[in-house]
Structures are given as structure tokens and as C-alpha cells.
Design a protein with these regions (language model features):
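Short-chain dehydrogenase/reductase
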Residues: 37-44, 72-83, 129-130, 158
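NAD(P)-dependent short-chain dehydrogenase/reductase
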Residues: 84-135
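Amphipathic terminal alpha-helices
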Residues: 191-209
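Conserved Rossmann-fold NAD(P)-dependent oxidoreductase catalytic core, especially the SDR/UDP-sugar
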Residues: 48-76, 94
Length: 209
């Protein structure tokens, strides 16, 4: 196992890997909108660099459902273009699209905004397939050798943001466009978006203590 980051990535050029997992792409949609050139470099050009300079049997590319549902945005376009590079590189490669996630390390995003009763700059009727990041990590570990192609993994269902706000009695207001982040896959996973409520309960408890 090798941990590759900004300070050592050049060290592993031509190194022979069995599997390379690329989770280096930016995940900030609003940042991408304000910094389109930087997002292109960090998403498309960086993926191209790894594909051209690293030796591997299989490349696992961690992408986003935005490549499907936000094709007209900078973020979505760049994610889609990076996927095309991976697909054309090797038919054994695996592209994993993720949706909204939650976990102990979460510090920003719509869930944190609602916990703190801040304005959420998305339409409240937006549907999100929230998924526990631990489940995602375990799925990748268990399936990285036998899966290939393009898969969206995550919760089998979704929750409207306004429903979460009302459930936790947040005072958040919603401003913005409809932004559905739903997992679409032939296989329906057992994990449910409703697990997010346990996470929110814990966060709210921490806030009051």
C-alpha cells in the first residue's frame, strides 16, 4: 500500500502498481464555478497525468453523480471528461460515481448548514441520496478487484432537504436552483439515506453539550 499525495506523487512515476485509486479530484462544486481553470487542471489534467505516467493493472476513479446530473456546469463537465479518459484507457478500469456523503469528519455542506440554521443555497425540494462514507469505503475494499466499468454507489433512496430541515427543527432557509443528487444503478444497495438522521442526532447533541 502506498499513500500518494502532492508532495510525493512524482516519486511513483513508472512504479508498478496492481491497483491505483484516484480520489484526488476536488469535490467543491461552488469552488469549481469560481475557478474553472483550476478545477480543470485538478480534475482532467491530473487524471490524465496519472493515466500516462503511472503503471498499473487497474485504475479506480472516484467521480461524482454530477458527471451525469450536472453536465452543464463546470464541475460536472470536468468530472465527465475525466471519466472519459479513464474509460478509454483500459476496459478493466472502474469508475465510481458518488453522491452526497456524511461521516464524522464532515465539516461543511448542506447538513452542517442546517444543523447551524444557516441559509442553504439550494432549493429545499432537492432530493439527496445521503450515504455513510464508511459504507462507501467498505464497498470499495470488497469490490475493487471484481468490478469494472461505470457504477454509481450509495443509498437506495433519497430525502428532500426540506424534510431534513423540518425533522431536526432547523431554521434554515433555502435559496437557489433544484439540485437532485440521486444514485441511479441497476443494483439497489441495502443502505438507506435515513441513516443520516442518526448522524445529525449526534451532531446536534455535540452542539448542545
Amino acid at each position: 500500500f502506498k499513500s500518494i499525495h502532492r508532495l510525493n506523487f512524482e516519486k511513483y512515476i513508472k512504479y508498478k502498481f496492481d491497483i491505483v485509486i484516484n480520489c484526488s479530484m476536488p469535490s467543491k462544486r461552488f469552488w469549481a464555478k469560481k475557478n474553472p481553470k483550476k478545477d480543470y487542471i485538478e480534475t482532467v489534467e491530473k487524471t490524465s497525468f496519472f493515466l500516462k505516467n503511472y503503471k498499473f493493472k487497474k485504475f479506480i476513479h472516484i467521480s461524482s453523480v454530477s458527471a451525469r446530473c450536472e453536465k452543464n456546469t463546470v464541475y460536472g463537465k470536468n468530472k465527465k471528461n475525466s471519466e472519459i479518459l479513464v474509460k478509454n484507457n483500459n476496459n478493466k478500469n472502474l469508475i465510481i460515481r458518488l453522491g452526497p456523503m456524511f461521516g464524522r469528519s464532515l465539516k461543511k455542506g448542506v447538513l452542517i448548514d442546517m444543523i447551524n440554521s444557516k441559509t442553504v443555497y439550494i432549493n429545499g425540494k432537492s432530493k439527496y441520496s445521503f450515504t455513510n462514507i464508511k459504507w462507501i469505503a467498505n464497498w470499495i475494499i470488497q469490490n475493487m478487484k471484481n468490478k469494472k466499468g461505470l457504477l454509481e454507489i450509495g443509498s437506495k433512496d433519497y430525502i428532500k432537504l426540506v424534510s431534513i430541515r423540518d425533522k431536526i427543527k432547523s431554521k434554515s432557509k433555502f435559496i437557489g436552483r433544484l439540485d437532485n443528487q440521486i444514485i441511479i444503478n441497476k443494483e439497489k444497495y441495502k443502505i438507506s439515506s435515513n441513516e443520516v438522521y442518526r448522524f445529525l442526532k449526534g451532531k446536534l447533541s455535540e452542539k448542545t453539550n
